[in-house]
Amino acid sequence: MPAPILPLIEAAAQWPARGALIGLDLGTKTIGVAVSDPDRRLATGVETIIHTAFKANAARLLLLAGQRNAVGFVLGLPINMDGSEGPRAQSTRAFARNFARLTDLPIGLWDERLSTSAVERELIANDVSRAKRAKVIDEHAAIFILQGALDRLTVLNAAPRTD
């Protein structure tokens, strides 16, 4: 049975209370990968995977998840500024559907609007060369996406319950 693909909050309900999450930023040529600590407080970069065949990319992601005892994935979903989903979002959803067939770890979708732009501005501000930026942008975007998701989950978990 394929893994569930859900909005972040619904996916979080499927994940155990503790355990690392793998954050993914699907670029056009690469996949940025980040990982959280088991308590889900901090995202750190893992690597940038250069797109090859889907099965090879998926095998690498599953290996990384296994090495880190991950309990789920957070996949950046590139929503347009008006809230609609364009071709990149459709491509991301197709990747998620195909990847879900290979794992039972729930996949949470997280709005990644402007993540790459924010990361690029930060790298430029830190005087990172254009060549170096091209090599690390998707990994840094994966960190940005995963950290945003972790922060959102922390806020929701800290909110007083009304039930």
Swiss-Prot record:
It holds the Pfam family RuvX. Its main location: cytoplasm. It is found in: Cytoplasm. The keyword Protease does not apply. GO terms for cellular component: cytosol. Keywords: Cytoplasm, Hydrolase, Nuclease, Ribosome biogenesis. SUPFAM superfamilies: Ribonuclease H-like. Its EC number is 3.1.-.-. It is an enzyme of class 3 (hydrolase). GO terms for biological process: rRNA 5'-end processing. One of its GO terms (molecular function) is nuclease activity. Could be a nuclease involved in processing of the 5'-end of pre-16S rRNA. Belongs to the YqgF nuclease family. This is Putative pre-16S rRNA nuclease. It comes from Rhodopseudomonas palustris (strain BisB18).
